[in-house]
UniProtKB/Swiss-Prot annotation:
CDD domains: Wnt_Wnt5b
Protein name stated in the entry: Protein Wnt-5b
Gene3D superfamilies registered for this protein in UniProt: 3.30.2460.20
Free-text tissue specificity from the UniProt record: Predominantly in neuroectodermal tissues.
Function: Ligand for members of the frizzled family of seven transmembrane receptors. Probable developmental protein. May be a signaling molecule which affects the development of discrete regions of tissues. Is likely to signal over only few cell diameters.
Lipidation (O-palmitoleoyl serine): 221
Disulphide bond pairs: 81-92, 131-139, 141-159, 215-229, 217-224, 286-317, 302-312, 316-356, 332-347, 334-344, 339-340
GO cellular-component term (any): extracellular space
Keyword Glycoprotein: yes
Amino acid sequence: MPGIRLLLAAALLCCPPPAGATSWWSLAQNPVQRPEMYIIGAQPVCSQLSSLSPGQKKLCQLYQDHMMYIGEGAKTGIKECQYQFKQRRWNCSTVDNTSVFGRVMQIGSRETAFTYAVSAAGVVNAISRACREGELSTCGCSRTTRPKDLHRDWLWGGCGDNVDYGYRFAKEFVDAREREKNYPKGSEEQARTLMNLQNNEAGRRAVYKLADAACKCHGVSGSCSLKTCWLQLADFRKVGDHLKEKYDSAAAMRINRKGKLELVNNRFNLPTVEDLVYTDQSPDYCLRNESTGSLGTLGRLCNKTSEGMDGCELMCCGRGYDQFKTVQVERCHCKFHWCCFVKCKKCTEIVDQYVCK
């Protein structure tokens, strides 16, 4: 990508902000507006984004039209994280500052690994689609080669999601902060940097791997005698499900004297570039703890009959739960009327709900 690596090299001369203090994820909270909306003569928006590292600010200045979509990607990743963990003690809750997730991300846990991966995946997803939609000046439709297993009579063309460009740009931008760091070999700080880079890559690979051919039929009366196919991103829920499986099988790692991550337990297989890794055990997230950033589970809804993580016994960490009644309003007794609408009544139901003490 022209100019990006030179800009990143120059950015290495600058001093990075304190680890974990801020994050580009905050672009999800404060989306950057389109460049054409800036007031002429105003200070460039990139210099005002304190959550970006020096290298990321350089990329922002060069690719300002990309920033809105980086924010969208971060928002997509955060939303998916909250969906995947909604029934867990840690539910990917955010805080109202530029760290986005608070101090909990300073722990090199499985949860941190997933968050880095799904956020990086969100950027690939958003940039790839923006290319296809003609929103960015430096990319367009996908130019990926025809899949070998595509039916020989089908046409390969159309305007596909540009996953190649999305992957490359996300790698340069998201990894920039980690690449600017120069910690002592074998240090805990270096271990965390390598962990972040591994998980960022796993997230990007998930989007790349799950993208597939989509086709449209042509022919007389929809006979589908001919198809035109193109590359299309997978639904992001599929990416989230894939990364959640990687979370469940994440590898515990430690740093060695050579400055490389190695398995804590050699009986397991080495992680591939598609796997998540972590360096710290997760806190239990049961109680609010300012030092770890845990918000605790006080007041969380739980399922009285479930034996899973959403069950009251596990969610409430054995502290017990309170029961209360709530009124739910739902559509009911729906009927189709000619032509052509459905008319429903509203039904109310009193249901029991349970919250952790």
